[in-house]
C-alpha cells in the first residue's frame, strides 16, 4: 500500500549528525540516503601531509561503510554518487588559486554552493525524484529564509551564506533545534553505530591534513625573508609565504628576538612575509572592508540592524553596509583584528542569515592596508 508521505533525500556522510537527521526525518517522510564521494587522494596527488595515504582502506570508504550500516539500521535505501572531478573543478582549483595569490579562502562555503546544494541536489531531484533534500547542518529554515541554529556553538549558517533563495527553497535541517549532546543522546538511544564517532575536521571532504605539507602537493615551497614591518629589518626566513595566515603566531620559528611576533601581511610577488611584535597589535586593525560576489538569499531585512561575522566562530560585529554596483559591498565596523582577504563576510539581521560576500580589501580610517 502506497503512503502519502513526501520523500526526502538525506546526505548521509557516515557521521553522527547526518545519521540522526535521517532518523528524525523517518517519522514524517519517506527517507532515502545519498552518500557523496568528493575526494580521491591518489587521483588528486594528495600524498604530503596525508597521514592516511598508506592505510588499506581510505577514510572516505570507511565513512561509506558507516553510512551503509546506518541505512541498514534505519531500514532506508542508500545510493552513492561521485563528484571527485566536480569538487576539484569548482572548489579545489579556487582554493589553490586563492592561496597562490596570498589569500585565505573558505572551501566549505564553495563546497556547499557548488556541490552539496547544487550537484547533490540536482541528482536528488532529477534522479531520485525527491520532494526535499536534507543535511546534518546546524541551521534553521523559517518561511523559506535561513536562520542560525538553536545551538549557537555549532551553528553553521556562516557556511551556507552563499546559497541562493532557490537553493534553500526545498531544504530541511532536522537538527535545527538540537544541541550536539542531544544528538549524541538520540544516537545512543537508537543504538546507531555512529553515536560515539568523532566529528570530522579539516578541509571540507578532504579531512585532517598537516596543512603546510598538504599545500606543498600543489604549490611548491619557496623560501624567503621575514621582515619586521616596524623597521623593515629581516628577522627570519619562511618556508613559503602561501603557508602563513594573517594573525598567525605559532610556527614562525623566529627565536632569538626580544619578543614574539605575529604575521601581519605578505607580499607574494616579492615572496616576503611581514611580521610585527606582539606589543604592536595595530597592524592587524581595520574598520572597513570592500567585498565582492555578494549573495543575498532574501530582500527581507532591516539595513539598520545588520551585524556580520568575518570568520567562523567569531562574535558578531555591528556593521553598516553600503551596497555598490556589480555585487560589491563596502562594510564599516568598529575596529576589528585580523580580517583577511579571501575569507567570507557573512551578514545577519538578528538571527536571520541574509547572505555573504568575499573580502577583497581592508581599510583603516579609509586608508587601504597594502601589506595585506
Swiss-Prot record:
It is found in: Cytoplasm. Its EC number is 2.8.1.13. Keywords: ATP-binding, Cytoplasm, Disulfide bond, Nucleotide-binding, RNA-binding, Transferase, tRNA processing, tRNA-binding. Residues 154-156, 311-312 are annotated as: Interaction with tRNA. GO terms for biological process: tRNA wobble position uridine thiolation. The keyword tRNA-binding applies. It is an enzyme of class 2 (transferase). The record marks 137, 343 as: Interaction with tRNA. Its main location: cytoplasm. It catalyses: S-sulfanyl-L-cysteinyl-[protein] + uridine(34) in tRNA + AH2 + ATP = 2-thiouridine(34) in tRNA + L-cysteinyl-[protein] + A + AMP + diphosphate + H(+). Residues 106-108 are annotated as: Interaction with target base in tRNA. PANTHER family: MITOCHONDRIAL TRNA-SPECIFIC 2-THIOURIDYLASE 1 (PTHR11933:SF5), TRNA 5-METHYLAMINOMETHYL-2-THIOURIDYLATE -METHYLTRANSFERASE (PTHR11933). Catalyzes the 2-thiolation of uridine at the wobble position (U34) of tRNA, leading to the formation of s(2)U34. Belongs to the MnmA/TRMU family. This is tRNA-specific 2-thiouridylase MnmA. It comes from Mycoplasmopsis synoviae (strain 53) (Mycoplasma synoviae).
Amino acid at each position: 500500500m502506497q503512503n502519502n508521505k513526501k520523500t526526502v533525500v538525506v546526505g548521509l556522510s557516515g557521521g553522527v549528525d547526518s545519521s540522526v537527521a535521517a532518523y528524525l526525518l523517518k517519522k514524517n517522510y519517506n527517507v532515502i540516503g545519498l552518500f557523496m564521494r568528493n575526494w580521491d587522494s591518489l587521483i588528486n596527488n594528495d600524498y604530503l601531509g596525508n597521514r592516511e595515504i598508506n592505510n588499506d582502506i581510505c577514510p572516505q570508504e570507511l565513512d561509506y561503510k558507516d553510512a551503509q550500516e546506518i541505512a541498514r539500521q534505519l531500514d532506508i535505501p542508500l545510493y552513492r554518487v561521485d563528484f571527485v572531478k566536480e569538487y576539484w573543478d569548482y572548489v579545489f582549483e579556487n582554493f589553490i588559486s586563492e592561496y597562490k595569490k596570498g589569500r585565505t579562502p573558505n572551501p566549505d562555503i564553495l563546497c556547499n554552493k557548488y556541490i552539496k546544494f547544487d550537484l547533490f541536489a540536482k541528482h536528488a531531484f532529477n534522479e531520485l525524484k525527491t520532494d526535499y533534500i536534507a543535511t546534518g547542518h546546524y541551521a534553521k529554515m523559517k518561511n523559506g529564509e535561513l536562520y542560525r541554529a538553536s545551538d549557537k556553538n555549532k551553528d553553521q549558517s556562516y557556511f551556507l551564506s552563499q546559497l541562493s533563495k532557490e537553493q534553500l527553497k526545498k531544504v530541511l535541517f532536522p537538527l535545527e533545534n538540537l544541541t550536539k549532546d542531544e544528538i549524541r543522546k538520540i544516537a545512543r538511544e537508537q543504538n546507531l553505530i555512529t553515536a560515539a564517532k568523532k566529528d570530522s575536521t579539516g578541509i571540507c571532504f578532504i579531512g585532517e591534513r598537516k596543512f603546510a605539507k598538504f599545500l606543498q602537493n600543489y604549490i611548491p615551497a619557496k623560501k624567503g625573508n621575514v621582515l619586521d614591518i616596524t623597521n623593515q629589518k629581516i628577522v627570519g626566513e619562511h618556508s613559503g609565504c602561501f603557508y602563513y595566515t594573517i594573525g598567525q603566531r605559532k610556527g614562525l620559528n623566529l627565536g632569538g628576538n626580544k619578543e614574539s611576533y605575529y604575521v601581519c601581511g605578505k607580499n607574494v610577488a616579492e615572496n616576503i612575509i611581514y611580521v610585527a611584535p606582539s606589543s604592536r597589535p595595530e597592524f592587524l586593525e581595520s574598520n572597513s572592508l570592500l567585498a565582492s560576489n555578494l549573495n543575498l538569499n532574501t530582500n527581507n531585512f532591516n539595513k539598520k540592524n545588520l551585524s556580520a561575522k568575518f570568520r567562523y566562530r567569531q562574535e558578531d560585529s555591528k556593521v553598516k553596509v553600503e551596497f555598490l554596483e556589480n555585487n560589491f559591498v563596502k562594510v564599516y565596523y568598529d575596529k576589528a583584528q585580523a580580517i583577511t582577504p579571501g575569507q567570507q563576510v557573512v551578514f545577519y539581521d538578528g538571527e536571520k542569515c541574509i547572505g555573504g560576500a568575499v573580502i577583497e580589501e581592508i581599510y583603516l580610517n579609509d586608508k587601504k592596508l597594502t601589506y595585506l
